[in-house]
Amino acid sequence: MSMVYANIFMAFVVSLMGMLVYRSHLMSSLLCLEGMMLSLFVMMSVTILNNHFTLANMAPIILLVFAACEAALGLSLLVMVSNTYGTDYVQNLNLLQC
């Protein structure tokens, strides 16, 4: 495994560990999710460029589209929770059920 792949994998693991450690705050969880998506995007792009996968050129862009949708939904949920309760705790999400 080259150093590029090792660094990208390490970034993914650090984001995953941050997700496990800072799971009580919604903003921290969203930032860790974005870090995971960014490392997956870079890993996919580097793999496609190194192996010359011509059929998979659109896969990283599709991943970015899903990451943007996830970020928009997460931020709207963060705004709704912080306006309703004044904090960004994940435990407040259970109170939003109908």
Swiss-Prot record:
Subunit structure: Core subunit of respiratory chain NADH dehydrogenase (Complex I) which is composed of 45 different subunits.
InterPro entries: NADH_UbQ_OxRdtase_chain4L/K, NUOK/Mnh_C1-like
UniProt key word Phosphoprotein: no
Family statement: Belongs to the complex I subunit 4L family.
Membrane-crossing residue ranges in chain numbering: 1-21, 29-49, 61-81
GO biological process: ATP synthesis coupled electron transport
Topology within the bilayer: Multi-pass membrane protein
MF term (GO), any: NADH dehydrogenase (ubiquinone) activity
Catalytic activity: a ubiquinone + NADH + 5 H(+)(in) = a ubiquinol + NAD(+) + 4 H(+)(out)
Protein name as annotated: NADH-ubiquinone oxidoreductase chain 4L
CC terms in the record's Gene Ontology section: mitochondrial inner membrane; respiratory chain complex I
Enzyme class: translocase
Keywords: Electron transport, Membrane, Mitochondrion, Mitochondrion inner membrane, NAD, Respiratory chain, Translocase, Transmembrane, Transmembrane helix, Transport, Ubiquinone
Source species of the chain: Odobenus rosmarus rosmarus (Atlantic walrus)
Enzyme Commission number(s) from the entry: 7.1.1.2
Family matches, as Pfam families: Oxidored_q2 (PF00420)
First-listed, main subcellular location of the protein, grouped into a coarse class: mitochondrion
Subcellular location: Mitochondrion inner membrane
